[in-house]
Amino acid sequence: MKKQIITATTAVVLGSTLFAGAASAQSIKVKKGDTLWDLSRKYDTTISKIKSENHLRSDIIYVGQTLSINGKSTSSKSSSSSSSSSTYKVKSGDSLWKISKKYGMTINELKKLNGLKSDLLRVGQVLKLKGSTSSSSSSSSKVSSSSTSTYKVKSGDSLSKIASKYGTTVSKLKSLNGLKSDVIYVNQVLKVKGTSTSSSKPASSSSSSSSKTSSTSLNVSKLVSDAKALVGTPYKWGGTTTSGFDCSGFIWYVLNKQTSVGRTSTAGYWSSMKSIASPSVGDFVFFTTYKSGPSHMGIYIGNNSFIHAGSDGVQISSLNNSYWKPRYLGAKRF
């Protein structure tokens, strides 16, 4: 009798162990901010499997949508180990969104903690993950710096921060340094007082207008040809290489063929570029897709068409397309 009890108990323990280890199908309701990538990480599965199980043709999901997922929740796997860090060094491919997810924070918390005015990051930049905010400089340093005529950009700086420090405005700083966007780089030397350099270009520049239609800082012909050369490259969430791109990774890759910009999100590009009424070749067009606000972007190539990394890979689409037309937010210039 004793032997039978032990055997039965063992069977129950083994059975419950096997049952606990098995991945089970479950229904989840999509919450605000969710993406297929988030869910695939959380439930230890893949985007392809989720799309296949739910007959999805794209990566777009909606708040309140019910999805069937085969997998196990991994939400508490790494939160405790990552939360002990107080700083983080930005790596290639990082974004505020990725870092905030990794350390259980919000993008706004990260930006406030590091005095960031936009979502742009630079490789090698050190971000604070805990501690007091670095929103403004002390009044004493503001007074002592007023006699300085140049300033070398440090990690975490922004035009807004520098303008506040030297008692000037972002517009004046940009004019003084001939800047066409709010993007600045570590070790860049900026004039904080003096004469404007914005009008130093020769007046007759019509011979080069065909290659610089929308921006004086980018060769538009090269931008478009570099982008078109990538048509057919597959879609990959967070991808920044020719093995696969997401929409902002594609833009980052093409821009870095000519200049040096940090990896950021579509929202980051939206907030750092200059608004224009209508796009010219080489400008950037923005859309709202799986969440409110800018969440997808592409490069305008003329004839009401744009090139972008969509769910089917890098492709050329029309702004009149029945999907894109109602989701169009506007155009920006680098």
UniProtKB/Swiss-Prot annotation:
Q: Which GO terms of the cellular component aspect does the record hold?
A: extracellular region
Q: What class of enzyme is it?
A: hydrolase
- Please give the InterPro entries that the UniProt record associates with this protein: LysM_dom, LysM_dom_sf, Murein_DD/LD_carboxypeptidase, NLP_P60_dom, Papain-like_cys_pep_sf
The annotated phenotype of a deletion mutant is: Cells lacking this gene are about twice as long as those of the wild-type strain.
Is Transmembrane helix among the key words of this record?
A: no
UniProt GO molecular function: cysteine-type peptidase activity; lytic endotransglycosylase activity
Q: Where is this region: Disordered?
A: 70-89, 131-153, 195-215
This protein's source sits in the domain of life called Bacteria
Q: Per the record's keyword annotation, is Aminoacyl-tRNA synthetase included, yes or no?
A: no
Pfam families for the chain: LysM (PF01476), NLPC_P60 (PF00877)
Biased composition annotated in UniProt, kind: Low complexity: 72-87, 132-153
- Kindly list the places in or outside the cell where this protein is found, as annotated in its UniProt entry: Secreted, Cell wall
Q: Which residues form the active site?
A: 247 (nucleophile), 296 (proton acceptor), 308
- Taken from the UniProt record, the cysteine pairs bridged by disulfide bonds within this chain are none
Q: Name one GO biological process term.
A: cell wall organization
SMART domains reported for this sequence: LysM
Signal peptide as annotated in the record: 1-25
* Record-given protein name: Probable peptidoglycan endopeptidase LytE
